[in-house]
Design a protein with these regions (language model features):
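Residue-level recognition of single "structural anchor" positions
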Residues: 1-185
Length: 185
């Protein structure tokens, strides 16, 4: 039990699976199995407990990552698995408590937006205010999942022009956000 607690503690603290394997003197397969088991337990606990949430304001967003290789590099990658490429984590967060009410991992499509919003609708109780970024797929998803039971707005960020955008110093830096625009739906 002590070793299991140590493995999970190190993973939660951000250690890599290989470093956890070395520190705890266990195989990397043991660490991977513990990670999968813990993930499945957390999924079941979240699904059971995060129901009937009374939330006033919910913020939905999506964040990009990749599995194995970026989508543009998958064809050139050696032995890329079927699920290789871009991955989007969709989130619905209570703006006040920061409770992660709903989440979904998928692509950046209208179907993924729909899955997130329908799951969210099944977890909240009462009328809510939903805010998203300007991704158009949210429009149909919010209307389909909530109908008239939600106040909905998009919050679009406005970015300034940057003369150094193409320079090596700016290649991986985000553009400067100079404001935002609210769009009530």
């Amino acid at each position: 039990l002590e070793t299991r607690v140590q493995i999970l503690t190190l993973l939660v603290e951000g250690n890599s699976m290989r470093s956890v394997s070395r520190i705890c003197d266990v195989s990397i397969n043991t660490v991977a199995k513990m990670l999968v088991d813990a993930g499945e337990a957390c999924l079941a606990l979240h699904d059971e407990k995060v129901r009937g949430v009374k939330s006033e304001r919910i913020q939905c967003d999506e964040i990009w990552s990749f599995c194995y290789a970026k989508a543009k590099n998958v064809k050139a990658a050696k032995a890329a698995p079927d699920h290789a490429g871009d991955v989007w984590t969709w989130t619905a967060l209570d703006a006040d408590t920061k409770l992660m009410i709903s989440y979904f991992v998928g692509d950046r499509s209208g179907e993924s937006a729909r899955v997130l919003l329908y799951d969210l609708a099944g977890r909240v109780d009462g009328r809510v205010q939903i805010t998203t970024d300007g991704f158009a797929s949210y429009l149909r998803a919010v209307e389909g999942a909530f109908g008239a039971d939600a106040d909905y707005a998009m919050l679009e960020k406005v970015y300034g022009a940057d003369k150094l955008t193409s320079s090596p110093e700016r290649k991986y830096s985000p553009a400067e956000c100079v404001g935002s625009r609210k769009i009530a739906i």
